[in-house]
């Protein structure tokens, strides 16, 4: 398998049905070195379904600054995915300070888009 470029991969996850994961999200999650997530137990349901085993770092509003310090050595030569419990990370989720840290250090950042509850709601509204 290919190694991903060092950086932060902001990966959207399914918002209801685990099978709504995109092919690109599955590929990125399988190739990153580490995954930062809100709730490891919740994230493991998706990762186990996909057959992906990675070291997980739990991210919450109360531990975000400490987490940034803890992963500082990994940032320099690792690919790290940021995922939320459902949907797009950073939308009502922790991770803003982590993203700002990557921006400040000029480390590669990319987004892997996925399902959108806003679009789904508009579609259902007719």
Model-derived regions: residue spans:
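Short glycine-cluster motifs
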Residues: 76-126
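Glycine-rich, highly charged phosphate/nucleotide-binding loops
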Residues: 62-71
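Glycine-rich, flexible N-terminal cofactor/catalytic loop recognition
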Residues: 1-62
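Alpha-helical scaffold segments in soluble metabolic enzymes
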Residues: 45, 70, 120, 124
């Amino acid at each position: 398998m290919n190694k991903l470029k060092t950086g932060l991969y902001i990966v959207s996850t399914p918002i209801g049905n685990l099978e709504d994961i995109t092919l690109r999200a599955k590929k990125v999650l399988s190739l990153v070195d580490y995954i930062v997530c809100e709730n490891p137990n919740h994230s493991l349901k998706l990762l186990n379904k996909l057959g992906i085993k990675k070291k997980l770092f739990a991210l919450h509003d109360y531990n975000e600054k400490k987490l940034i310090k803890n992963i500082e050595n990994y940032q320099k030569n690792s690919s790290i995915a940021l995922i939320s419990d459902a949907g797009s990370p950073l939308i009502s989720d922790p991770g803003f300070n982590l993203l700002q840290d990557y921006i400040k250090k000029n480390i590669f950042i990319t987004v892997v888009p996925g399902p959108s509850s806003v679009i789904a709601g508009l579609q259902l509204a007719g």
